[in-house]
Amino acid sequence: MREDYRNAVDRIALTDGKKAALYHQIRLTATPHKNPDAKGRMRWGKRKLVWMAAAALSLVLVAAITINSIPVAAAIATPSYPSEEETANAMADDRYLDALRRFSYQTAGKVERGADGNTVYSPYSMSVVLSMLAQCTDGETREEILHAFGLDTLAQLSEGTAGLYRLLYRDTEEYLCRSVQSVWLDSSLSYNQDVLQSLAEDEYAYSYRMPFEDGRAASAVSDWFSENMKNSRNISVPFIPGNKLMFASGFAFRSEWEEIFIKEQTYEGVFSGTSITGNCEYMNKVAAAVPYLQTEKATASLIGLSGGSSLILILPQEGKELDDILSDGALLQDIVSRTLHAEKTSVEFSIPKVSFEETIDISSVFGQMGIVSAFDETKADFSALSSDTGVFAGQIAESAVLDLNENIETAIGEKAYGSSSGSMYSLHLNRPFCFIIVSQNEIPLMIGAVENVMQLEE
């Protein structure tokens, strides 16, 4: 159907830019959508968690020299997503998992936050980007990537990435956990077919070839993400004119609360932020038999999500700074690990409803971790992918959206609260805190920090 739209628009006597705009307008009109609510947000059902309809988008933009013209994008390699049998039998190498955990927590203190002090990103998505870059590079550039990740060989990284992908992959109405990748090449760029096929098999990446002109590349990638991220928000793709090569990696996550929040228990309270102190709405519930940890530096607990994943909430102790925890990757990893295995008890949660979008430059994160030659046009080595010279990584940006709210109505007979005859602890997130979504095998899927809370619009 998409090709029909393209052909119809191409027959009209318009400039390429106007053709692209008309094509997208036709697609928006012709493509069926799920029913949105009055605010344009998607409804996933009463018991669906809208803790995070999260989408993390990573882009690697590589400098260009020349551009040729071809009509539309052509697929080069296409992945086949894991079957139920493949996910059921998937295994991940322990050394790779240990390296990924260390890498993930080390990034937390290196990510720049927005003007409001808040941020959310996917270290897992970052790791897939690194694996893709490693396969496309060689020499010193590849060595820097492997060293930053803590592995010795490309095979360890690519095979580990592939194994974990199959282990984590789920795509059902109740639970979505999927990383999506694509590689976009300008029509003038030479390429190694075997490398692109390896990206399809190991990182499950699509690859396309098209002219990077008249905004077509940015529009094509935006369309691709709209179709593959399963997210109701439009994802804007930055594009620098003159680029030859673009790597795009995103992470889509949707889950359910294991024990639901109900709207009747939501209340208004004060959040004391670093720059804003004011009222906001708090979700509230009591959960029975959940891990609870108290240390000199932080209090932490978790809320179970479907699919075996967990939302870990970490509140620094009074007088302690959030940066003290985030800037110490080993400390953050220790708190998460101890929380996951802490003694279980009853905990009352008060969690502010937050919603924000962030775009961060993760090239600076990689630079702080020792990956520098990929961004230096005199040293970058992308010879594994292309025989062209002068190719280097110009920019890496990651965009993410976060919604944290109950968004659930209590059904008759449905469990809403836990109860206990023993002692009960509380975790009131009324000042800056951080959160981590971890998979069943304790891989950090998303990391975020909340320093200031703005009231959600009703």
Where do the language-model regions lie?
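Non-catalytic, conformational "gating/processing" segments within enzyme and secreted inhibitor domains
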Residues: 77, 88, 116, 154-317, ...
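N-terminal export and membrane-targeting signals
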Residues: 41-52
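Internal alpha/beta scaffold segment
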Residues: 316-343
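Extended hydrophobic
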Residues: 247, 299-314, 420-457
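Short Gly/aromatic-enriched secondary-structure transition segments
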Residues: 145-149, 261-269, 324-331
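Single-pass transmembrane signal-anchor helices and their membrane-water interface zones
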Residues: 17-30, 50-75, 417
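Disordered, charged N-terminal biogenesis/targeting segments of membrane/secreted proteins
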Residues: 1-42
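Detector for small/aliphatic-rich hydrophobic stretches
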Residues: 3, 50-56, 65-211
